[in-house]
UniProtKB/Swiss-Prot annotation:
Residues annotated as domain F-box: 64-112
N-terminal signal peptide: none
Entry-linked InterPro entries: F-box-assoc_dom_typ1, F-box-assoc_interact_dom, F-box-like_dom_sf, F-box_dom, Gal_Oxase/kelch_b-propeller, SCF_F-box_component
Pfam families assigned to the protein according to its UniProt record, in alphabetical order: F-box, FBA_1
Protein name, per record: F-box protein At5g10340
Organism: Arabidopsis thaliana (Mouse-ear cress)
Length: 445
């Protein structure tokens, strides 16, 4: 006798007092004999034990999901394949489902699965959007909109993410980590780690550098050099997330040490110093970049205009120079930039009429390979001439480059190296700082 096949019919969730059940009905006439193993039926749907599960929704029925499938099958083979928004809705199915979805181990498996299986593009997050013209016309308008997100290749409009810190100026660390982003202020406000998809957030206190800077601000004093910016990343061995401030402390008149490094510990909710700190001065004008368990900085320019890439291993908390940058005789530190493209460490230099982007070879950490070249003549004809180097953000559709001018933050460009074409996929009348991220359920306990 042939095995029946079923799919789940989409219906509305019943009233709370009625049991929430799964309704199943036949999908196709041909038997699917897979045995008790999750696979895909000939029509591409998930299947288990010969039953085709075309979708997972809820309705009143005689048979519960747990009776149809063991929970470990549901968790490891079905729930892990669902996107974040769907899983957030499914938290109301049962206490067991909620417990699973809130489990850090499940959240990590779900993220790993989607990053390995999905070819989808990252989301773009705009931080502290600001329209100076609108404020001048109407002083009642809020100065800043905290967060707004969009997908570059989507026709959908950008979406505002409500937060408790509207109308406050925040900046964002250069790279996201596991769907988390880190907001910071130079000295006015405490920092915040945020999951923009789930809207979870956690505020943490100022580091010692920020406290000194705040004291200077109250006395209307300022530093004689550019202010440093923090980095945010993850110890891949322990799974611990770490915000890091590295700065040239002697230049800032903070102490007599060339550099000082502070790391925040979420377990103790306190900052601590890293000893020894960096053996090299860094460029404060450049944001640190997180790649594969380490944060990276440019070292200060030599008299010949050379710079090196400095790395901090977030597990051992040790510094080392991993490579010389592929460019020589840098005339201005604002003409170079570091970034993460597809989990690869990349550096770029603007030198008219091009801006070239190199990727560091993962095998030897010494060889640089040119992967993109931006035609500055074409980009300047599209909207304006960039004062500083463009900031590369992400790779879309496997090879299309997304980048923007960080001094304005109101226009984004894509470059297709195959067709050598350029496009303006998103523009805004408001300035912002920007970071890319992939949706996740991750939070920091």
């Amino acid at each position: 006798m042939g095995t029946s096949r079923y799919f789940v019919r989409k219906t509305t969730i019943p009233p709370p007092k009625r049991p929430r059940r799964i309704h199943v009905s036949p999908c196709h006439d041909t038997p699917i004999l897979f045995g008790d193993e999750v696979k895909r039926c000939p029509w591409g749907h998930l299947a288990y034990g010969g039953s085709c599960l075309q979708s997972i929704t809820l309705r009143d029925s005689e048979t519960s999901m747990e009776e149809l499938l063991p929970h470990d099958v549901i968790e490891y083979h079905i729930m892990v394949r669902l996107d974040v928004k769907t899983l957030l809705k499914f938290k109301s199915v049962s206490k067991q489902w909620m417990s699973t979805i809130q489990s850090p181990s499940f959240q990590e498996r779900q993220l790993i699965h989607h990053l390995s299986q999905s070819s989808g593009d990252p989301h773009v997050l705009l931080v502290s959007l600001y329209d100076p013209c609108a404020r001048q016309q109407d002083p009642s308008i809020s100065s800043f909109e905290a967060l707004r997100t969009f997908l570059v290749e989507s026709s959908a409009a950008s979406v505002q993410i409500p937060t408790p810190w509207e109308d406050k100026l925040y900046f964002v660390c250069n790279t996201s980590c596991d769907g988390l982003i880190c907001l910071f202020s130079f000295y006015e406000l405490p920092s915040i780690v945020v999951n923009p998809t789930t809207r979870w957030h956690r505020t943490f206190p100022k580091c010692n550098y920020q406290l000194v800077a705040a004291d200077k601000g109250e006395r209307h004093e300022c530093f004689k050099v550019a202010c440093p910016t923090p980095g945010f990343g993850k110890d891949k061995i322990s799974g611990t997330y770490k915000p890091v401030w590295l700065y040239n402390s002697a230049e800032l008149d903070l102490n007599d040490k060339p550099t000082t490094c502070e790391v925040f510990d979420f377990a103790t909710n306190a900052w601590r110093y890293v000893f020894p700190a960096s053996p090299h001065l860094i460029l404060h004008t450049q944001d640190p970049v997180y790649v594969d368990g380490s944060l990276h900085w440019f070292t200060a320019l030599s008299h010949e205009g050379e710079t090196m890439v400095l790395s901090l291993d977030l597990h051992s908390e040790t510094f080392q120079v991993i490579s010389k940058a592929p460019f020589l005789n840098v005339s201005d530190e604002y003409y170079i930039v570091m970034c993460n493209l597809g989990d690869r460490l990349c550096v770029s230099e603007q030198k008219w009429p091009n801006q070239v982007i190199w990727s560091l070879d993962d095998s030897d950490h010494k060889t640089w390979k040119q992967i993109y070249s931006i035609d500055l003549i074409i980009t300047s004809s599209l909207f304006f001439s960039a004062i500083f180097a463009f900031t590369p953000l992400a790779v879309l559709d496997k090879d299309k480059l997304l980048f923007y001018d960080s001094t304005h933050g109101d226009a984004f460009l894509t470059h297709d190296p195959d067709t050598k074409s350029y496009d303006l996929p998103y523009t805004s009348n408001r300035c912002a700082t920007v970071v890319c991220y992939f949706p996740s359920l991750i939070s920091i306990l």
